[in-house]
């Protein structure tokens, strides 16, 4: 029957196509594994040319390429070059034209690092590098010199010394701080005795002398006004 013959012919054609594909695969594998380096390079160049042509047909215009310049496929010279030495084509970059203000050189003395001057001590108000920029659109901030770190460390040490001296002066007037220092040093009893002796001497020097009695003795013991413990310490 004709239908059965057509089916047999189609099945035979499919079998022949599969055999051809298998043969081509085997030939390709043999050429890659057993062929010389020239054949491999030629095959790689042909594959790359085919891929580039397909990519050029899919994307007619490249966004990076300037208008009016068509993409050219690699010629026979490019195919003859080995694949390991071939380089991708350079793509031109479109850059905006620079303005005259940005291209022009900055005026001399426009930038000066405030912390770059060695030997100059900075205060607490400006511990970081501050670049003094002159008026003008072309003046740009620049890097500071290497001495700014050394100046910052010196200023910090001076500030710590000032704070330590100020704290010591304030500690003499603070009774709680003085009491803490005496307790830690172990001189609390000595300081209390010294202050009591000073108070007794002050009272004896300023107080009126008591009148002597008929027996030539004193009418009573001397009255000594002692200060409270809070005022002593």
From Swiss-Prot:
Q: Which InterPro entries match?
A: GSK3-bd
Domain of life per record:
Eukaryota
**Region Disordered: what ranges?**
1-24, 204-233
Task: Kindly state which keywords UniProt assigns to this record, in alphabetical order.
Answer: Wnt signaling pathway
Task: List all Acidic residues biased stretches.
Answer: 7-24
Return the annotated region ranges for Involved in GSK-3 binding.
Answer: 174-196
Keyword Transmembrane attached: no
Keyword Amino-acid biosynthesis belongs to the record: no
What are its GO biological-process terms?
Answer: canonical Wnt signaling pathway; regulation of protein export from nucleus
Q: Name one GO cellular component term.
A: nucleus
Q: How does it assemble?
A: Binds GSK-3 and prevents GSK-3-dependent phosphorylation.
As for what it does, the entry says:
Positively regulates the Wnt signaling pathway by stabilizing beta-catenin through the association with GSK-3.
Q: Which family does it belong to?
A: Belongs to the GSK-3-binding protein family.
What name appears for this protein in its UniProt entry?
Answer: GSK-3-binding protein FRAT2
Q: Which organism is it from?
A: Homo sapiens
């Amino acid at each position: 029957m004709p239908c059965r013959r057509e089916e047999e012919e189609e099945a035979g054609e499919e079998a022949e196509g599969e055999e051809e594909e298998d043969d081509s695969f085997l030939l390709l594998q043999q050429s890659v594994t057993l062929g010389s380096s020239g054949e491999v390079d030629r095959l790689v160049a042909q594959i790359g040319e085919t891929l580039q042509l397909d990519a050029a047909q899919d994307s007619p215009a490249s966004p990076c390429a300037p208008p009016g310049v068509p993409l050219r496929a690699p010629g026979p010279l490019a195919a003859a070059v080995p694949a390991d030495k071939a380089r991708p084509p350079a793509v031109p970059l479109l850059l905006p034209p620079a303005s005259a203000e940005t291209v022009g050189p900055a005026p001399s003395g426009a930038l000066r690092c405030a912390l770059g001057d060695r030997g100059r001590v900075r205060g607490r108000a400006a511990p970081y590098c501050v670049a003094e920029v002159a008026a003008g659109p072309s003046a740009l901030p620049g890097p500071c010199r290497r001495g700014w770190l050394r100046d910052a460390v010196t200023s910090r040490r001076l500030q710590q010394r000032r704070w330590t001296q100020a704290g010591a002066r304030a500690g003499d007037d603070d009774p709680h701080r003085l009491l803490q220092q005496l307790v830690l040093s172990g001189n609390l009893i000595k300081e209390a005795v010294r202050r009591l002796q000073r108070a007794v001497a002050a009272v004896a020097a300023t107080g009126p002398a008591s009148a002597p009695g008929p027996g030539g003795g004193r009418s009573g013991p001397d009255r000594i006004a002692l200060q409270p413990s809070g005022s002593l310490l």
